[in-house]
């Protein structure tokens, strides 16, 4: 019996895959537990529409991330911090601070987890990588100056 998996099933397949399962396994395990449904023509049509919608959504997200990466490329983010002797900052500039400043200066909402940098503890210029989407990233220059 052909079955469309509704959830990941260990050893059988992932959600959305069509598998061949024995009739007993499908009727007694997969179908009653809501792990799969019979692969009828109407169910296959629904599955194909869902996959197409997911593909379009992923394409839109990729295009949006590429546009954002292009708009941020070679931008300079200026930040001000209090520093002591030798240009050492009181406190440090973290990825959260950079994400907040990006929102203020460029009106771009980026999650702090997508800002890839070491904690900045000195005044100066730094290259910071922004991972906007899998395989899409850009670099910006962060300039830390004293008040």
From Swiss-Prot:
Database matches in InterPro entries: Ribosomal_bL9, Ribosomal_bL9/RNase_H1_N, Ribosomal_bL9_bac/chp, Ribosomal_bL9_C, Ribosomal_bL9_C_sf, Ribosomal_bL9_N, Ribosomal_bL9_N_sf
Annotated disulfide bonds: none
Domain of life: Bacteria
GO CC field: ribonucleoprotein complex; ribosome
Keyword Ribonucleoprotein appears in the UniProt entry: yes
Pfam families: Ribosomal_L9_C, Ribosomal_L9_N
GO molecular function list: rRNA binding; structural constituent of ribosome
Keywords: Ribonucleoprotein, Ribosomal protein, RNA-binding, rRNA-binding
Coiled-coil boundaries: none
Listed GO biological process terms: translation
UniProt family annotation: Belongs to the bacterial ribosomal protein bL9 family.
Function as written in the Swiss-Prot or TrEMBL entry: Binds to the 23S rRNA.
PANTHER family linked to this entry: 50S RIBOSOMAL PROTEIN L9 (PTHR21368)
Record-given protein name: Large ribosomal subunit protein bL9
Originating organism: Clostridium novyi (strain NT)
């Amino acid at each position: 019996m052909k079955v469309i998996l509704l959830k990941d099933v260990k050893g059988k397949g992932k959600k959305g895959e069509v598998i061949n399962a024995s009739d007993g396994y499908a009727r007694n395990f997969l179908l009653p537990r809501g792990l799969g449904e019979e692969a009828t023509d109407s169910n296959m049509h629904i599955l194909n529409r869902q996959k197409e919608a997911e593909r379009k959504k992923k394409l839109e997200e990729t295009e949006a991330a590429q546009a954002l990466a292009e708009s941020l490329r070679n931008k300079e983010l200026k930040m001000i911090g209090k520093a002591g002797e030798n240009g050492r900052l009181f406190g440090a500039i973290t990825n959260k601070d950079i994400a907040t400043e990006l929102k203020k200066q460029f009106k771009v909402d980026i999650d702090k987890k997508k800002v890839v940098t070491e904690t900045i503890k000195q005044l100066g210029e730094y290259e910071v990588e922004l991972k906007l989407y899998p395989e899409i990233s850009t670099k910006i220059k962060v300039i830390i100056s004293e008040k």
